[in-house]
Swiss-Prot record:
It comes from Mus musculus (Mouse). InterPro entries: DnaJ_domain, DnaJ_domain_CS, DNJB2/6-like, J_dom_sf. This is DnaJ homolog subfamily B member 6. PROSITE patterns: DNAJ_1, DNAJ_2. The lineage of its organism: Eukaryota, Metazoa, Chordata, Craniata, Vertebrata. GO terms for cellular component: cytoplasm; cytosol; nucleoplasm; nucleus; perinuclear region of cytoplasm; Z disc. The keyword Chaperone applies. Residues 252-262, 272-290 have a biased composition (Pro residues). GO terms for biological process: actin cytoskeleton organization; chaperone-mediated protein folding; chorio-allantoic fusion; chorion development; extracellular matrix organization; intermediate filament organization; negative regulation of DNA-templated transcription; negative regulation of inclusion body assembly. Coiled coil: none annotated. Residues 243-365 are annotated as: Disordered. Residues 2-147 are annotated as: Interaction with HSP70.
Length: 365
């Protein structure tokens, strides 16, 4: 007998959030489009995963399953479901696994890169029709879903189960289609998805083309191409080429906001640029100075005046001349001590004679 907890790979006390995470992982793993080489086994596993999620994601169904097993739900596995006596008076019919898959993913196509865009971009309106034909090899795009975050945590709409978006009062989405094809690997993968909305009476069609890792998004308004982006960046050249190919005029790009004028006071004058500071030259080392000789602060004596020659008698002058000791000059011949004594005696004798003559002269007068 199949154990739904084992099918999803969870424990019996797993939380509703764990159930959702497990279904997402197992449904993407065993989807028949991902396993074309083992399609029969994949279809069987995919159906079991859908049944397990239908039962364990509902509190009442899970309680009945825990008490009575699968027999308590369908009375022997006929697939048609029966009513039976239970505290819930519950009858159950398993749905098509593809319907469960589409309902879980909110009507979006997980086979295209469009699935990773804004989760509410194309949700509003009716549910899309049956899945388009898909043909994938072993290297399908599904391998990229292994690290995708939980839908329960990322998209609030999945927390309470699927709600038809038409009931939300948004009738903008009128159609949705998707076509994916490729070879044996990701190198030849191509996905094309188209969505149409009616916004303010205008028909807005968004076409996404993903090929070899490059995404091209074209937006039309009433059949007129309005914008074209490649990998999220607007490409004006590609837009012009596509419009020319379609025979349509190129839409004018919206001008950007004009810069606000800067008001300058009339008295204000532009400041002169401040010159760059010139580095000061490095001063040369001062030469060592010899200390000046100390100058005495004592006042110098004035020079002695030259002696004034006294005019007197000849005798006085001669006496002074005789009394003054004569200093020999360089021209004087050297004199011996005997010569000096002799000269002195002669002078004294002459002086005595002169005195006698003076006295005699005075006596005659």
């Amino acid at each position: 007998m199949v154990d739904y907890y084992e099918v999803l790979g969870v424990q019996r006390h797993a939380s509703p959030e764990d159930i959702k995470k497990a279904y997402r992982k197992q449904a993407l793993k065993w989807h028949p489009d991902k396993n074309p080489e083992n399609k029969e086994e994949a279809e069987r596993k995919f159906k079991q995963v859908a049944e397990a999620y239908e039962v364990l994601s509902d509190a009442k169904k899970r309680d009945i399953y825990d008490k009575y097993g699968k027999e308590g739900l369908n009375g022997g596995g006929g697939g048609g479901g029966i009513h039976f006596d239970s505290p819930f008076e519950f009858g159950f019919t398993f749905r098509n696994p593809d319907d469960v898959f589409r309902e879980f993913f909110g009507g979006r196509d997980p086979f295209s890169f469009d699935f990773f865009e804004d989760p509410f971009d194309d949700f509003f309106g009716n549910r899309r029709g049956p899945r388009g034909n898909r043909s994938r090899g072993a290297g399908s795009f599904f391998s990229t879903f292994s690290g995708f975050p939980s839908f329960g945590s990322g998209f609030p709409a999945f927390d309470t189960g699927f709600t038809p978006f038409g009931s939300l009062g948004h009738g903008g989405l009128t159609s949705f289609s998707s076509t994916s094809f490729g070879g044996s690997g990701m190198g030849n993968f191509k996905s094309i998805s188209t969505s149409t909305k009616i916004v303010n009476g205008k028909k807005i069609t968004t076409k996404r083309i993903v090929e070899n890792g490059q995404e091209r998004v074209e937006v039309e308004e009433d059949g007129q191409l309005k914008s074209l982006t490649i990998n999220g960046v607007a490409d004006e050249n590609a837009l012009a080429e596509e419009c020319q190919r379609r025979g349509q005029p190129t839409p004018a790009l919206a001008p950007g906001p004009a810069p606000a004028p800067v008001r300058v006071p009339s008295q204000a004058r532009p400041l002169a640029p401040t010159p760059a500071p010139t580095p000061a030259p490095t001063p040369a080392p001062a030469p060592a100075q010899t200390p000046a000789p100390s100058v005495s602060t004592r006042p110098q004596k004035p020079p002695r005046p030259a002696p004034t020659a006294k005019l007197g008698s000849k005798s006085n002058w001669e006496d002074d001349e005789q009394d003054r000791q004569r200093v020999p000059g360089n021209w004087d011949a050297p004199m011996t001590s005997a010569g000096l004594k002799e000269g002195g005696k002669r002078k004294k004798q002459k002086q005595k004679e002169d005195l006698k003559k003076k006295k005699s002269t005075k006596g005659n007068h």
